């Protein structure tokens, strides 16, 4: 009997050790790029986010004219409209990120992320809400996610309401957060969207939206919070996640509060 009790106790201790620390969580905005030798949305920024143990690395995805998903914030890259340009042109060795890396493909980004299996991948689809574009980009996204086996790590965000609604249908087990900032949580919940990720001044104007979202079981993220005073205020308001260019500062504040 004593052996059985000891076995059960050890099992509980191991389970407790394996649990992910409770939130709030820190998301590195476009990866952790504010370090030597890195750049926004680069493979190194992803690796830096993993190195510091960030909850998630946020990144932006565009679709090229020939159907390649690439990681880049703007709709343009070195003056070229990504949606109207083939991948080979964008991947020219003369066109680099600030740290000398080439523009990453989504496949390359996912492959590099496998070294950090505990880190979430906060996927922003860059879209102007064009149905034809999203009809290609969303299925290609899901295919890439499944190909690399990272489905359990994905959280979707987008300014495109239609993309959020469709992601919620395509991958109902994943968190989908709308970025726009103008819609109350209850209305989004009715559409099947499971989170809000609003620019932080929105929550100063509508702090009640945080409680409203939580009552509906929705996730509350906020961007892009870089000053300590804002981080403290938003943590007091009760956000679940902070997206920031200063992830180590946010980590220290959260550890201090806990």
Protein language model annotation of sequence segments:
Residues 4-13:
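Sec-dependent N-terminal signal peptides
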Residues 17-258:
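Phosphate-group recognition and catalysis centered on beta-loop-alpha active-site segments
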């Amino acid at each position: 009997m004593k052996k059985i009790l000891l076995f059960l106790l050890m099992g509980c201790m191991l389970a407790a050790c394996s649990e992910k620390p409770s939130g709030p969580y820190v998301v590195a905005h476009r990866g952790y790029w504010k370090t030597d030798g890195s750049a926004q949305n680069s493979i190194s920024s992803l690796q830096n986010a993993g190195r510091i143990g960030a909850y998630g690395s946020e990144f932006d995805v565009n679709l090229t004219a020939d159907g390649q998903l690439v990681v880049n914030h703007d709709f343009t890259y070195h003056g070229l409209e990504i949606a109207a340009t083939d991948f080979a042109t964008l991947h020219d060795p003369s066109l680099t990120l600030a740290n000398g890396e080439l523009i990453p493909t989504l496949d390359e980004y996912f492959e590099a992320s496998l070294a950090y299996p505990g880190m979430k991948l906060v996927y922003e689809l860059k879209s102007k809400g064009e149905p034809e574009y999203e009809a290609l980009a969303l299925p290609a996204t899901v295919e890439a996610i499944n190909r690399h086996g990272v489905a359990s790590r994905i959280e979707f965000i987008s300014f495109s309401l239609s993309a959020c609604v469709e992601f919620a249908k395509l991958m109902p087990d994943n968190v989908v957060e709308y970025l726009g900032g103008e819609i109350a949580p209850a209305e989004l919940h009715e559409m099947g969207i499971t989170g809000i990720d609003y620019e932080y001044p929105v929550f100063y104007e509508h702090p009640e939206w945080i409680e409203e979202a939580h009552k509906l079981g929705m996730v509350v993220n906020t961007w892009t919070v870089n000053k300590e005073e804002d981080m403290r205020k938003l943590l007091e308001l009760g956000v679940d996640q902070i997206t920031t260019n200063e992830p180590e500062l946010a980590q220290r504040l959260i550890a201090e509060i806990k």
